[in-house]
């Protein structure tokens, strides 16, 4: 179980949201929705421990993710902007992720699922935005963690790829995984998802 308790986040001197709480249980999909600039990405990056919350806590199975390396190893994050290095080939990227997790045996399965075999020798920077997205999402399968956190999972994907990723996410949840997604609005792809709405804030600047 992943639990966000009274989380507040700040960007610069602007309070994005405050006292946000929700629980994401195993076997569930949580969809974080909100307007552009509302703080969806900031919340996801806080959940995975990349940036600190201004206040509140994020816990996985009762352990604070900011101090537990065991928690971080159970989470895979795929951001809206890919973290892939442009000069690396697709094969090199998959091997790097697998090396980080000790999951080299999963490279072929990820490449097969996302149809990456024809582009394994292509440098990431030379791919279209749609193929770059497929490569970025393949990290979910290579890393094989219990918690998936994905920012705008369907951006830049064609309809066939959207269906592929939808099935992947549903299957992960059915098998007991925790899936947290962010998008601009609710969609019909995950009708049973828990919705976490980030409301507009009128709090303005933050003072200490």
UniProtKB/Swiss-Prot annotation:
GO BP annotations listed: cytochrome complex assembly
Domain ABC transporter, first and last residues per copy: 2-208
Top-level taxonomic group: Bacteria
Chain ranges passing through the membrane: none
Enzyme Commission identifier(s): 7.6.2.5
Listed GO MF terms: ABC-type heme transporter activity; ATP binding; ATP hydrolysis activity
SMART domains assigned: AAA (SM00382)
Catalyzed reactions per annotation: heme b(in) + ATP + H2O = heme b(out) + ADP + phosphate + H(+)
Name of a matching Pfam family: ABC_tran
The entry's keywords: ATP-binding, Cell inner membrane, Cell membrane, Cytochrome c-type biogenesis, Membrane, Nucleotide-binding, Translocase, Transport
Protein name, as recorded: Cytochrome c biogenesis ATP-binding export protein CcmA
Taxonomy of the source species: Bacteria, Pseudomonadati, Pseudomonadota, Alphaproteobacteria, Rickettsiales
Gene from which this protein is expressed: ccmA
